[in-house]
Amino acid sequence: MTSAEIREAFLRYFESQGHTRVASSSLVPANDPTLLFTNAGMNQFKDCFLGLEKRDYVRATTSQKCVRAGGKHNDLDNVGYTARHHTFFEMLGNFSFGDYFKRDALTFAWDFLTSEQWLGLPKDKLYVTVYHTDDEAYDIWNKEIGLAADRIIRIGDNKGEKYASDNFWAMGDTGPCGPCSEIFFDHGDHIWGGLPGTPEEDGDRFIEIWNNVFMQFNRTADGVLHPLPAPSVDTGMGLERISAVLQHVNSNYDIDLFQHLIKSACEIINVKDEGQPSLRVVADHARSCCFLIADGVNPSNEGRGYVLRRIIRRAVRHGNKLGATGTFFYKMLQPLIDVMGDAYPELKNDQARIEATLIREEEQFAKTLEQGLKLLEGELTQLSGKVIPGETVFKLYDTYGFPTDLTADIARERDLEIDEVGFEREMEAQRRRARDAGKFAVDYNSIVKVEGETQFDGYHATAGQGEIVAIYKDGEQVDEVVEGDEALIVLNQTPFYAESGGQIGDTGLFKNDTGIFEVQDTKKSGGAFVHQGIVTMGSLKAAQHVDAIVKADIRAATARNHSATHLLHAALRQILGTHVQQKGSLVASDILRFDFANDQPVSFEQLQEIERLVNAEVIANSAVTTELLDIESAKAKGAMMLFGEKYGDEVRVLSMGSVIDEHNFSIELCGGIHVQRTGDIGLFKIISEGGVAAGIRRIEAVTGTKALEVVQKADADIQHINSLLKAQKDQTVERVQAAVEQTSALHKQIEQLNQKLANFQAAELLSQVQNIAGRSTLITTVQNIDAKSLRNLHDSVKSKLEDAVIVLAGLEGDKISLIASVAKQYTAHLKAGDIIKHLATELGGKGGGKPDLAQGGAPLNEKFEHVIAALPAWLEQH
């Protein structure tokens, strides 16, 4: 069976067992700030397992795209060198949300694996593990399925503490957890390795192919396990692993899917030996990179984009090791489409953008390598020993993306080594900084534990009443808060909008006869709306009723910006093309920010046309309508859906703007607050456009009175410019143009005069040349000269004094500029960089450079004259 046939067979089998086939979620986790990438089939169902979300099915089956690279799950360095490490893989899974449990889960797995109708694996090739106290699972395997006792292995707490086991799964330190049962396949005694639980278990003979996790308990902070009222099932089987089993190969890289990619890489790079690890790297990384880009990740220097950039560069580096020249990696997309495009049509649909992104990143990496080589060459010329410092290796790696293996290769060519210990020390420091400063946010789920949902009554009202369901202070639930206490309060119903879809949460206040609570923000925790704020008077208690009052002016301004954001999105797609996809947004009361996918900056003319389109819809003053539809009806209506977002079976469809071909100007799914008519927006004005990451642009805009303020400020600035230029309003551009041309001409004259002055000064300085250590040497101080003019003077002197050592110090205000050059015949013993480093160190400044030319600077201080006077003696010794 091919990998594609195995994937389809798995999904069809579980459909036949009453499961709903659910599409793979995006590799960018939706509404889960704790994850870098989707790395398991259960990620998209996390809220279902936590009881925070209910769907119209209780059984599901998926083939989930997963990436493990960066963060907690980082397989990157092993990829290509082992049989089963990948950055991208597919996880086949079946799930039960409080429906069936161990008996059905294990029976399904055994039936699918061994039945001749499905995979037909030999039963004598299969072994299973169970948690050592899970007698229920053991008995199901032994007494009901009929597996011999010597094929069932009990695994205890093999990770150092209670419930820390390969066969016990936990979502976190507290919360859902439970035992699991894994199924292993025996590849045969010709391959080294032992059964699970033996010293040889890390070998490749017995390979785990399926894991059945039983969410049976809730673990509390005291470590006690309490049975869940509705236990659930989460299973996972790696498609690549089961394909290797069915295709009778031991390495995942030998399955049909990878072999097509590896053979294609050989053709693209012109390589004959298909067994090289670098080919496996290119094949694996092509999958993760193409799928990540398709799911909206773009190469950048932070977060997910940084991980993608590292993977691309690692692939390109390995391609270069194989002999690839120019851009080649983007060509791997078409072979990937050949084998995975039917299952994942986003690859074909987004082919042009994926290829363009890869080409751009390859070209950028080529420039980066060139810059890194220059830096490395500079460091090597100043190296005093045989070891390149770890700090230098890390700087090349971290700042320039320079692969450490390339640094090591260059070092070996010069009979040098790299300080691997020092490099690892720097890497660990970076990891520590990342853990401290770059942790993903923790949401309120870890604090707020409320059954049921808050009823939102705020679409058409800014005030209402509600009962206090829960109060939290300092992370703990309390019954009462008093004046000065900061707290989180949950009501049974509220007019306050909770932050979602880019729109900020409402602010305002709660009040009753006993106290006032200032609401500073509103967020969601599952179905609960959490009001964050401070008690400003009196006290509030649980079960009390309060008047909930939203700040109406802030709400109205936010609504204007939210509706304008929808119009902006539609206008962008009209002007730039339908490839434009939202990548992020902020809807506040004073500004709107919209991030979108686009490879090029938006031109001034395009921005004007976008503004014109949006304001035309504002002037039209059409109604903004909402309706609740099932998801299929919403799609049929043409509603925009954000890729990677999770939508329920019933969605809120927002339509606004003029009707063209029976479709509104803008139709999107949205749960936010909006104006009633487009005219309520008043005026729309773009205030900035720029890039925030490769392939991602950002537009910031304002509406209503804020937009009027921007226009009036621009008018005032023009009026001020006219008064300075003594120009009439219709003469502004003409007068500014004339002033620019005049200024440019004056700058040229100044440059010419400075050059004449430098030539004149250079001729005078030649009389100060002296012989130091057998070298013609000029050391002098020049008054009232900036760094650029000092460089010009140096160049003039050097043109007249080629075979010499030149050291110039320029003084301007409280600054010292330094420049030194050494004729090439002297650089074996004396380096310009060393001269500048010596002077800068003595003067408390910085500087450095190449052996023949270096520059630096320092603050002017009382040591200056002494340091310059002592320089000849220093040169005598070097």
From Swiss-Prot:
Subcellular localization(s) per the UniProt record: Cytoplasm
InterPro entries: aa-tRNA-synth_II/BPL/LPL, Ala-tRNA-lgiase_IIc, Ala-tRNA-ligase_IIc_anticod-bd, Ala-tRNA-synth_IIc_core, Ala-tRNA-synth_IIc_N, Ala-tRNA_ligase, Ala_tRNA_ligase_euk/bac, DHHA1_dom
UniProt: Zn(2+) binding residues: H562, H566, C670, H674
Binding note for cofactor: Binds 1 zinc ion per subunit.
The keyword Protease appears for this protein: no
Domain of life: Bacteria
Listed GO MF terms: alanine-tRNA ligase activity; aminoacyl-tRNA deacylase activity; ATP binding; tRNA binding; zinc ion binding
EC number(s) reported in the record: 6.1.1.7
Protein name: Alanine--tRNA ligase
Organism of this sequence: Acinetobacter baylyi (strain ATCC 33305 / BD413 / ADP1)
Gene: alaS
